[in-house]
Amino acid sequence: MVKKELEMYNLYTFQIDLDKKLLFEKADNQQNYSKIRARYFKNSARNQQAVFLNKNLIKNTFNKALLNFSDFLSGSGVESIFKQVIDDQPEVLNYLKQVKKEDSCDGHSEASQLVFNVVINPKNTLANFFEELTIYLHFNEENNTVVGSFSLKWNIKRADLFSETKNIAINNLIHTFCKNNLNEVSFIQIIKCFAKTLINKQGQIVLESCAFKQKWQNIVEQKYPFSTIHKNLKIVNSDFFDAFFVILLLICHLNNNLLWLCEKTEHFEWKLNSKISNFKEDNTEVYLSKMLLFLKDWYFENQAVTNEDIEKVDEVEDIGKLVEKYSANQPQKLSSNSTVYVFEPDKKQCFLKNDDFFNTNEAKLLFLITMQPNVFGLDDTAIANDLNLREIGDFFKEIDFTDSDVLNDFQQQKETLLVRRTFNQLLFMNSNTDVLSIVNNKFKSAIHNIVWTITYSKAIMLKAFDYSKIFEQNRTNDPSLLRSNLNSINRLRYLSEYFRTASVKYDQLYTKVKEYMQLDQFLVDMINQVNHEDEIFGKYKERVYLSLGIVTAVVFGIIEFFNCVWTVLTVSQQTAEKSLADPRNTVIIGIGTILVLTLLITILTFMTRRLYLFEFNKKHK
């Protein structure tokens, strides 16, 4: 039996444009930041906005203030979830513990990697499922960007590998469930999923009425692996669900704080809610209800909504409408998760020489269920798949690895997904950007490097998606900005190369992630499309100028035509009235008028048809 030393992390990546000037302007209105800034700039140079990330500024106090979420926890009444960190500043509640700070590989102070741990209170019921939340931040002043990830570590009990496959199965199932029901990880989307959930007269959310949660429970009852015991089933279909979304709401809040600080967006300050209530520490359902209700209370405390708006809140969906109403321009830049599995075998091996680790069936099961979950119906089609997860163990036992074809197929898949091989580590990645690291010693630095590499690659993709949205808007509304879009995309390619250099220890993994996401091809296609649209816009401008020239020429031509007609008419000043009655003059004027009208109608028809076809092709391209 293989000794189990498995760790599992869910990653949620974000990318934020950094506005240094705006950051300091907002900092002036924050008590926590104004003191730090005044102390730092006391004897600094005149150009205060030229330096943002000087080493003296990147201190624990600044980052704790930057990521402080005690207001959110206290305001929703759930401050007992996390283990507090004792700080020299007692007036600031904090849960962050800095575990790593180092300059990037290029040695410049303007780019630094910061890592913080947020430990879940072991006495709290959430600790039954999750152990800690790690926050990764990379501030890059040169490229005016902030990238990072939230890494959620599962609490996995020490057991044999076969029994732990259920945790991996549940992770795949919740990931698939969220992917099919959440367009993106954000407050708005979570609130929408809890729509139609009733709020009683006491202001409490009745989660029993939640169709979204009921959908999860129905899936779990059909798919939950290994156990039909009612107690175990309740833990997964209710307690786990509530705990998972409590953490997601917290992650969304932290991301909102960073967005508010770093971007020119309409964000409000998260102030402490005066309505603090205490409740039992073993009720995840109440945690989730409190956090959802805190959104409504927070808007009321900050006077962002009227009393009339509050009185109309009868369902969670109504809270979502308020959020959309007052945060309509809020960008959402939190990606769906990747999962990192880290496994330490019971015996140290030299992976350069052989693959003895995969001689056991347990090791093969570990590889298949993490890297090829589709074999067990755990991929994106898991919900519609007829395979019941209780049959995983039996299904796996039926696989005959003594069959040369089966074994060769397994070896081929293993080599295809292999990214990195050293004497101490085997690193695999599948097309979902899930990573399996089999390592003799689980050093934290190795885990950090993997997370950073995935973070950098996904941050580039997030930025590319942003540019594609901006391009579509400009293509329709203001094509004159297409050239600036092209410059932004080209800068993104240089930023991608910069991040590859920052991931030098795992550059192969970085390249593999980009390959799976087809990032380079996406950028090339977008550049070609921008060039094509810009060329069309250039030709369109030429046609407009040509049309204006033709119209101008026609106007002058008409004037000259009438001048010419007037000269050939038999009209004199003395006999004007008699001349107008002359039928010859009437015929000449009539013929001239018909010719002019025909010319004008022809020109207008041609121009209108060309404009119509241009707009039609643009809309249906």
From Swiss-Prot:
It is found in: Cell membrane. The chain crosses the membrane at residues 240-260, 548-568, 587-607. Signal peptide: none annotated. It comes from the Bacteria. Keywords: Cell membrane, Membrane, Transmembrane, Transmembrane helix. InterPro entries: MPN337. One of its GO terms (cellular component) is plasma membrane. It is a multi-pass membrane protein. Its main location: membrane. This is Uncharacterized protein MG241 homolog.
